[in-house]
């Protein structure tokens, strides 16, 4: 069985996923494409030599008889409508973050999927598929160094451009930590606060950088997440879980060490694509394989997208108010409580 994809959005991430499905992964094929810029969509089909039709809009693409699964890589505010259309048509859907730009939008998707009666949606939280995070998750789940007490992590970028506004530090950057930490320690968030140290001289006037986000879980785990998007030295992701009997840390990226002029060092990546390229491959292959094997995706689901949205909204309020914000989630439906094969179980 080949899973036939229709792609909504042919920007940078959309093109990368299309190349991935056509050239690197097994079991998938691009058969339909659409974009607000029709010429761009046609150009992609021509350049990649795809056997795919270009549709005038997302609705017509979703309705196409030869589309089994919809890949949503459109503009963030369009995701909600794209996903709801796919669910209405009974099509599987892989959607890049965010699932929706509001918690209310996420809830609409959750209700639509539950009414359909089976899982159709997977959200593109790719860090769960990163080899290092997978190893860290296994170490945590094995409990061989006790229960988690604290987590320290950092998300550092060399620099950002003028289009990067202050809110993006939460909704575009911290959002990755919000999801992966929720998955790593398997505990619900209770509150969030944000503090701002001295501002770096490299930050543009409109941006507060760096910032430290403190999350507390219902189980009492205290998480500090540094967001520093103008650190200059490289793209650096850190995570350290302090346990009752030891510490588990995210492995460093593989790199040769060098000795030169009385210096011993290693290279640091400058780009997120290099850091997580394999994780993108694994998450989409897992999406394809899960559907072929069980008839449902088993990766990050619509509920995970809702948790991320609620938590990010609270973190943004904390950033702007200077006050701790409590995180109030609706009760998790049993529909999303059934254990599926997780990425780390499939990879280890």
Curated annotation (Swiss-Prot):
GO terms for molecular function: inositol 2-dehydrogenase (NAD+) activity; nucleotide binding. Its EC number is 1.1.1.18, 1.1.1.369. The keyword 4Fe-4S does not apply. Pathway: Polyol metabolism; myo-inositol degradation into acetyl-CoA; acetyl-CoA from myo-inositol: step 1/7. InterPro entries: Gfo-Idh-MocA_inositol_DH, Gfo/Idh/MocA-like_OxRdtase_C, Gfo/Idh/MocA-like_OxRdtase_N, MI/DCI_dehydrogenase, NAD(P)-bd_dom_sf. One of its GO terms (biological process) is inositol catabolic process. Keywords: NAD, Oxidoreductase. Involved in the oxidation of myo-inositol (MI) and D-chiro-inositol (DCI) to 2-keto-myo-inositol (2KMI or 2-inosose) and 1-keto-D-chiro-inositol (1KDCI), respectively. This is Inositol 2-dehydrogenase/D-chiro-inositol 3-dehydrogenase. It comes from Halalkalibacterium halodurans (strain ATCC BAA-125 / DSM 18197 / FERM 7344 / JCM 9153 / C-125) (Bacillus halodurans). The gene is iolG.
């Amino acid at each position: 069985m080949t899973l036939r994809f229709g792609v909504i959005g042919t920007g940078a991430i959309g093109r990368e996923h299309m190349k991935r499905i056509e050239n690197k992964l097994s079991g998938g094929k691009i058969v339909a494409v659409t974009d607000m810029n029709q010429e761009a969509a046609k150009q992609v089909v021509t350049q990649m030599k795809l056997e795919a039709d270009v549709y005038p809009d997302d609705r017509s693409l979703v309705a196409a008889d030869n589309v089994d699964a919809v890949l949503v890589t459109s503009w963030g505010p369009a995701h909600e409508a794209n996903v709801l259309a796919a669910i209405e048509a009974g099509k599987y859907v892989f959607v890049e973050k965010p699932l929706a730009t509001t918690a209310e939008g996420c809830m609409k998707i959750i209700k639509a999927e539950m009414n359909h009666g089976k899982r159709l949606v997977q959200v593109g939280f790719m860090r769960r598929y990163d080899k290092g995070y997978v190893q860290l998750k296994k170490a945590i789940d094995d409990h061989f160094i006790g229960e988690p007490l604290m987590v320290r992590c950092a998300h550092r970028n060399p620099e950002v451009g003028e289009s990067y506004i202050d809110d993006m530090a939460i909704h575009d950057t911290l959002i990755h930590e919000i999801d992966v930490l929720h998955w790593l320690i398997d505990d619900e968030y209770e509150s969030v606060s944000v503090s701002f140290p001295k501002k770096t001289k490299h930050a543009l006037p409109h941006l507060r950088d760096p910032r430290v986000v403190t999350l507390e879980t219902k189980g009492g785990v205290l998480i500090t997440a540094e967001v520093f998007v103008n650190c200059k030295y490289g793209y650096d992701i850190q995570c350290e879980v302090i346990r009752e009997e030891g510490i588990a840390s995210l492995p460093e990226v593989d790199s040769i060490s060098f000795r030169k002029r009385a210096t011993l060092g290693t290279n640091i990546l400058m780009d997120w694509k290099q850091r997580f390229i394999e994780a993108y491959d694994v998450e989409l292959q897992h999406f394809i394989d899960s559907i072929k094997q069980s008839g449902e995706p088993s990766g990050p689901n619509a509920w995970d997208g809702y948790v991320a949205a609620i938590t990010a909204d609270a973190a943004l309020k904390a950033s702007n108010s200077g006050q701790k914000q409590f995180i109030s989630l609706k009760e998790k439906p049993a529909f999303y409580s059934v254990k599926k094969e997780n990425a780390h179980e499939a990879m280890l």
